[in-house]
């Protein structure tokens, strides 16, 4: 089961979230959890062309955080500014839209994760209350549109008799009653009807949102107080960076402050990079920015990372002063082999080393290629923790089995002490008697393990085919609990583990016969024959 969750999560990370690798600046990677916009890089087009010539797809991104405002609320978000065409070629989530469409290049359009859309009441509501539906109808442009909106909703369909319910479903009566009182979008709604409903809701202003963010820009201060320059900046710099700073700034003999001698030059740019790398607070300029956008789609893919508080907006819509003033810069370039199989994990030709070698001539200093595993610490922590727990459980199960088998063999050999003495009196060596008991115990273990493995395989068949519905757990945890799975946790076949289990159980049973057999063989033959 854990193997199935692990494999599905790895595939979903590669196919829906990251690709095989990312090209980023080393400085950005060191602070990636902070999403440092100022550590972006230009010239990604040349890298992309070089990758394409070597048989790789690539997709640029500019990742930033902010707050999204809708008519009904606000939510903290992570935004991915993407190239829609390249993104769709490399990753698969743009095809998994719950409603609407993916944003088009050059337009201030936004696709939201399903959970964010639900929180902000954006998109097509699937389970509105009666009051919410009446509000939607009242906001429709015409009476005909209002009637159309009302016609698409009705009471939720009753569960079929005997229908399966998730074992993890919340059984709170109050919550169940509230859910039962909600209406539901009719199951037979066609794409044309949903598109018309989306257009009506968009015309009412439901899809209008505003992004509030802070643009972080590297900027060498034109003036720095002397105490701060000498006491904070210079000690944080290396010898070469310190020399550049002293050459770029001149000390005012009257005030003692340091002033930038030549703003806008290459030397000033090098100094501002040194300041940012050292963490000097004055090297980053913060600019508050508002960006108006329209939500055109809701993403609901098999990877929960694309379905949470995340938004996707065209990269070219944020280039100028009305956006983020990107000037062609990106924070990362996703990479995947062209035509790669979604069911397969990246191979050697998609390793960071292979990708770096393919673009070595075009890869600027300061940029590095890193594999997808470097970006999924949450998943690896969850998997490793569960793996340790599983190993401990297996260890204790084997320990209990060993104790049970050893106790059974002890009683069996103890009851046959006279038989053991008779065999030894008839000429069998101690080794032959020991071998007989070990083979007997091993055969018993083999029969038991065969039944156990067969029962386990039979139980695993529905686990592989259907899995366990964890959608209720996923929803309660906001869709993000480490593993990149949204609803069904499926098992997988592991022939090696199955074979090792059978062989291990057989050997364990045989080993359990050794201690009581040796105890019986240490008894003199005469005492064995008189044993009662």
What are these regions (language model features)?
Residues 1-5, 384-419, 442-455, 503-511:
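Hydrophobic alpha-helical transmembrane segments of multi-pass inner-membrane transport and secretion
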Residues 5, 451-500:
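Short helix-loop junctions at transmembrane helix boundaries
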Residues 159-390:
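Mechanotransmission and gating elements of multispan inner-membrane complexes involved in transport
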Residues 488-532:
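C-terminal membrane-exit region of the final transmembrane helix in multipass inner-membrane proteins
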